[in-house]
Amino acid sequence: MVSAQQVEVRTKQNINVMKLNTLNSVMVLATTFADKGDWTVEQQFVLQMGSSYLLAHGIGTPLAKDAVTTVTVPCDGEYNVLVRTKNWTKHWSDGPTPGIFEVKIDGQSDGVTYGTDSVNWYWQKGGKVSLTAGEHTIALHDLTGFDGRCDAVILTTEDYTPSESLEEYFELREALLGTPVVEDKGSYDFVVVGGGISGICAALAASRLGLKVALIQDRYVLGGNNSSEVRVGLGGQINIDPYPSLGYLLNEIGPDRIGNARGAHHYQDDKKLNVVLAEKNISLFMGYTVIEVEKSGDAIASVVAQEATMQNRIKISGKYFSDCTGDAHLGYMAGAECRMGREARAEFNEPLAPEKADDMTMGVSIEWYCEDWNTPCTFPDSLDWGLRLDEYTVEPVHRANWYWEVGMMDDQVADAEKIRDYGMYVAYSTFSYCKNRYSKKEDWICTHLTWVSHVSGKRESRRIMGDYILREQDLTRPIHHEDETCTTTWRIDQHYPMEKNSKDYPNQEWLSYGVLTPIDFYALPYRCFYSKDISNMFMAGRNISVTHIALGSTRVMRTCGLIGEVVGMAAAVCARNNATPRDVYTTYFEDLKELMRKGTGRTDVPYTQFYHQVDRTGHQAEDR
């Protein structure tokens, strides 16, 4: 129910928005610039802040090439410049932010430095420019290479600055840019949302069993955490009893090299893409984020997805869906019961669970590395804005690894951009300290910060509840179930903030440690792979039906790939029998078992998945 006060506020906003129209204003989204220059399209946070945006990810070096576009101004006049941006370091520092840029109109700066004020996305009021009706150029000129960001620019003759309200932002967009046209892309047997390892495997398995499949991926690269954008290696074991044929599919797409934070080629993005493109039954939609769900009763009927440049929307209908988003975005929008955080010990009698439930999760790793070259280089000193480091708190390493982990105390969905930003903030601050103030800085004279990811490597967020919730004691006793499927092989691997790091940086920790609880190889119940609330939705990946503790084993990527393969098979069983995912458990499980015995992967390709199969290496292991 909407209150009278909310109606009053909304009415006032509508009146204000109406001041800006196509007769006195022009709006351009940064992601629609004709030439984006060296700026990066950033689409991770569409569901949080309403849009994709351009990011100046120069790793401390100002971008060489501006983003430039042409706009048509409606009339002669004095135009106010408004820019939707934010001060991304203000969460942790009141000093001058490094994430700044200029806006140039017809080659001339309007005299304002953008990205300096609010920690939230807001409309920063810029200068005034005299313009004649007709075409003019707008350019975004980065000043630092430290991740300044721009979502949109408005030129208006009205003296009005919009609020931070997302509702008002959407109204402005519609008033100045029109209502987006949604292109209907047809209906599919199986719609997979999320193109990480689990989503790829789900789509491939279903396709090879004859289903018409749509695979929707919000990035322009497949692979999720195992892509060149995030650079986390695969972990876990495949081809294990009771269904040893499960895993050959993952072998087809998995890189043949171990390691976190290595060169882009290490993660073999093309290998994944080429296997998917070879499947005639798969329609691949890259760069699309699902933003709306249409339901029919308790089933999903269709989804609407927004393309990353914000120019196109598509509608995809389906008979069955799988949430492989990691964050459970599809299930959450569809109304499925989700959990996030740690369950209380008493709820499931899990010995490793905390006494009281809380919101803590395992965190995000922002991978980065530096390299020693033969040429000296400098790097800006972050003293005025960076993390406060000294000889005792700095980690003078050349490469981040799994234990560089942020955001454990934050909301992994709502605070996703802040968490990502803090990971970059720590990386920049660490390298800057080593280059400029460290007692051994002479060892860093020729060290270059080569790569910092701007894409979050997530471990945990929402989990969708199924007909069964996997618990700690299922894994440790173990307790076997009649609906056994693929096998999890990783120990229960729980991460916590390092005590010293918590003391030095309370609620802003960035170093973690792992607690490993041994398990026998364990076959996961099928009932963890479909929603108890949405009658036609599966899930595969880290958002399956498990407790926080059990997730410590099931979340690693090879295991997620096995789950995806099983889910693709289950979708095929559903399609053949006009059944629901639950019906597969109650009526058609023998059909699924037959498919699992056969597998869907090829055995005539080189087998490369020998590395990092079972974690026996303790605290400083990779890929955790």
Which ranges hold each PLM region?
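Extracytoplasmic
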Residues: V7-E183
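N-terminal Rossmann-fold NAD(P) dinucleotide-binding loop
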Residues: G199
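Short, solvent-exposed loop/turn and secondary-structure capping segments
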Residues: W92-G95, R149-A152, E164-E167, A203-A205, ...
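Conserved N-terminal/central alpha/beta ligand/cofactor-binding core
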Residues: A205, L211-K212, Q217-S296, R339, ...
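Beta1/beta-strand and adjacent pyrophosphate-binding region of the FAD-binding site
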Residues: D184-G196
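Flavin (FAD/FMN)-binding glycine-rich loop and adjacent Rossmann-like elements that form
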Residues: L177-D184, N225, G287, A299-S302, ...
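Bacterial Sec-dependent N-terminal signal peptides
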Residues: M1-Q6
